[in-house]
């Protein structure tokens, strides 16, 4: 594996660690909602920075990616309604960041009906950013790129576009 591939694999592992720690802290709390999620995400970031899983700067970047993915997961689940319960069933998704996000979604239930407009708008993913598994759609040519696990957003294989929307 080349150094660049090793770095990407390490970042994907760090992202999954952050997602799993966030999941653990959020589900351990009594409150459900966006504010509780933000607190759990910040605590997960602080903990993993303290134990040297990543630098403060790397952790901040991963935290932003996870927050974006969480917003997208919630928005997508709200759009799908009942179908989301089946599609985002944690036992169906296996391990990794997407499974952690799905578990949080399952336990949160209707709390997110009052989310801010941010989660209702389309969230843009850019080449090079970290994200969980899902289907990215190129904004330039509508080509679909399927990510089977956490990783970096690649350029579009059809048109080399760098901006995507995401579904699951």
Enumerate the predicted regions with their spans:
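Amphipathic alpha-helical membrane/lipid-surface binding segments
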Residues: 4-119, 123
């Amino acid at each position: 594996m080349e150094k660049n591939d090793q770095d990407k694999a390490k970042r994907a592992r760090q992202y999954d660690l952050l997602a799993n720690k966030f999941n653990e802290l959020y589900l351990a709390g009594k409150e459900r909602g966006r504010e509780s999620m933000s607190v759990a995400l910040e605590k997960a970031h602080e903990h993993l920075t303290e134990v040297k899983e990543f630098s403060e700067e790397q952790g901040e970047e991963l935290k932003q990616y996870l927050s974006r993915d969480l917003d997208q997961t919630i928005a997508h689940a709200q759009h799908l309604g009942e179908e989301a319960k089946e599609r985002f069933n944690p036992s169906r998704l296996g391990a990794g960041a997407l499974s952690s996000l799905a578990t949080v979604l399952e336990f949160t239930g209707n709390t997110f009906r009052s989310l801010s407009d941010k989660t209702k708008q389309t969230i843009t993913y850019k080449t090079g950013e970290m994200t969980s598994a899902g289907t990215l759609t190129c904004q330039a040519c509508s080509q679909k790129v399927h990510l089977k696990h956490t990783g970096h957003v690649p350029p579009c294989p059809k048109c080399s576009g760098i901006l995507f929307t995401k579904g699951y």
